[in-house]
Amino acid sequence: MKNFKQLLVMFLGIFLFACEDDPAEVVEIVVTPPATYTFERDGQSTVSFSGQSARLEMAAELGTWLNTPMKTAAELDAMFNDGTGFGNPALAASGKKLGNKTASSSIASSTVKPQFDALIVDVTSNVFPNVANDASAGTPGTYTDPGGRTVIINGKGHEINQLFIKGLMGALVCDQIIWQYLSTGKLDGGTNVADNDAGTLVDGKSYTTMEHYWDEGFGYLYGLDTDLNTAEVEGGSSGGDVLVSKYMNKVNTSSLPGISQEIYDAFKHGRAAIVAGAYDVRDEQAEIVKTKLSHIIGRKAADYLKSGADKIDDGKWADAHHALSEGWGFILSLQFTKNPDTGSPYYSNAEVNSMLADIDDFWTVAPADLRSMATSIESKFGF
């Protein structure tokens, strides 16, 4: 009997040791994204991005007024920094603003937001008072190509509304999506992971904080879309968003075919991963969004530089000023992209400022230099 007890103890010890030695079973979470960006809880939609829709609408109207010599600097400043003075009274009532979300992430240089404020001063002090004058090198005013485009520009040929709006492509949209709402620091901040795992909802809402942050990132691209059931942003090309979704549509049918679907699918997949608690999948999809958005910025920066060079060669100066003004804004935006190989922007703030200085005077910049800069951008992005 004594020997039996000893054998039993030895057997139990070996059994327990073997159990402890077995590796814990890893349960893989399978994430199945929905066909459309539709997510519900208890019959209620959990998707909300009204603040982003408001800011996109603000940007569209502000862009119009920056090219219409009727507003004062104070009025334009109020629209940008205070969120007031818009034709739609609901925008002011929303409490949302563009200025406080412009170049506001931790990677943004503190010098960028003042550049936008300076553009408001420039257009109201130099351009608007001189629209009755014929523009020329060093002289602000209006320039019209024979039988073609008309632009109102400063003495360097800058069409201010284009610099401003194209600059918001990066300083607002990419900065908010890439460096804030889809960043792990934002998504996983505080108790967000534990709350999402437990299904703890924001007070009075149908969504968790993590779900909402992801949706807000989504909203900076799709906030004015009239049909979220497709990858195409229906409001992005006419009468809707004037920011990144408009140019996503453009490159989707030309130089970056299929990019709209890739971004839309990644947003859907990442949001489904949040619902499932599969944060590794979420992060993989976030990186797809960040890389593809960055490619849009890089592609258009190069495109407008080349277009500007071609228009100068053709003697179409109004077209050249317009294209280079758009290019200026997209170059400014390069510092808000993300290179997946380095985890940093494709271009630093210092590099961007150097590039802007090189093309500063649109009347005198050499087409060869514009094409060289475009080629350099294409090379860095791997186009």
Language model features by range: what are they?
Residues 15-18:
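C-terminal motif of bacterial Sec signal peptides marking the signal peptidase cleavage site
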Residues 2-10:
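Sec-dependent signal peptide recognition
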Residues 8, 25-26:
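Detector for intrinsically disordered, low-structure N-terminal pre-sequences
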